[in-house]
């Protein structure tokens, strides 16, 4: 992996704690950073984003090598971590700061995301329409350090939250098997 070959991908899928591990454990991923994007406040804090006044959503920014793990595969992993039929948040996390968005860094990513969304919608996997937003990537602000790699630092809390939030059951019911 050389720095020149690396690209960025940005996904919002509810609580960013739950979005890191599924990507971080894939080959070709250099790093996954939890943060905030899509809003109007410069360098927002977690408290500000949760207040709903910044316009930002919790998101992750992935640095990846597309020769090892192409963007198409990242989008596939993304869908399998979210409820793409819920635009008002994800699982127990409600509101604009938890809305699902695929933030595209270029036209190629946008085309891939749009085709993937259309295919998922046409597949009939879900009874409701796929409402995940596809938007142009904006400035990404890394979250506070205690949010980074949460699944490694706070394993029991992370695993409990996956279950208590309803995310784990939804993923099992809709994506496993």
Curated annotation (Swiss-Prot):
SUPFAM superfamilies: Peptide methionine sulfoxide reductase (SSF55068). One of its GO terms (biological process) is protein modification process. Pfam families: PMSR (PF01625). Its EC number is 1.8.4.11. The keyword Oxidoreductase applies. The active site is at residue 15. One of its GO terms (molecular function) is peptide-methionine (S)-S-oxide reductase activity. It comes from the Bacteria. Keywords: Oxidoreductase. InterPro entries: Met_Sox_Rdtase_MsrA_dom, Met_Sox_Rdtase_MsrA_sf. It catalyses: L-methionyl-[protein] + [thioredoxin]-disulfide + H2O = L-methionyl-(S)-S-oxide-[protein] + [thioredoxin]-dithiol; [thioredoxin]-disulfide + L-methionine + H2O = L-methionine (S)-S-oxide + [thioredoxin]-dithiol. PANTHER family: PEPTIDE METHIONINE SULFOXIDE REDUCTASE, PEPTIDE METHIONINE SULFOXIDE REDUCTASE MSRA 2. Belongs to the MsrA Met sulfoxide reductase family. Has an important function as a repair enzyme for proteins that have been inactivated by oxidation. Catalyzes the reversible oxidation-reduction of methionine sulfoxide in proteins to methionine. This is Peptide methionine sulfoxide reductase MsrA.
């Amino acid at each position: 992996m050389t720095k020149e070959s690396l690209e960025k991908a940005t996904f919002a899928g509810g609580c960013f704690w739950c979005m890191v591990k599924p990507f971080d454990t894939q080959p070709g991923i250099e790093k996954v950073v939890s943060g905030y994007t899509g809003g109007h406040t410069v360098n927002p804090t977690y408290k500000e984003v949760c207040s709903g006044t910044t316009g930002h959503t919790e998101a992750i920014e992935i640095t990846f090598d597309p020769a090892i793990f192409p963007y198409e595969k990242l989008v596939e992993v993304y869908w399998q971590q979210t409820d793409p039929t819920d635009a008002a948040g994800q699982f127990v996390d409600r509101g604009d700061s938890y809305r699902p968005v695929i933030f595209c860094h270029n036209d190629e990513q946008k085309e891939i995301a749009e085709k993937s969304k259309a295919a998922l919608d046409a597949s009939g996997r879900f009874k409701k329409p796929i409402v995940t937003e596809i938007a142009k990537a904006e400035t990404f602000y890394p979250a506070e350090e205690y949010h980074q790699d949460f699944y490694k630092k706070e394993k029991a809390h992370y695993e409990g939250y996956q279950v208590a939030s309803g995310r784990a059951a939804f993923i099992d019911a809709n994506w496993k098997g």
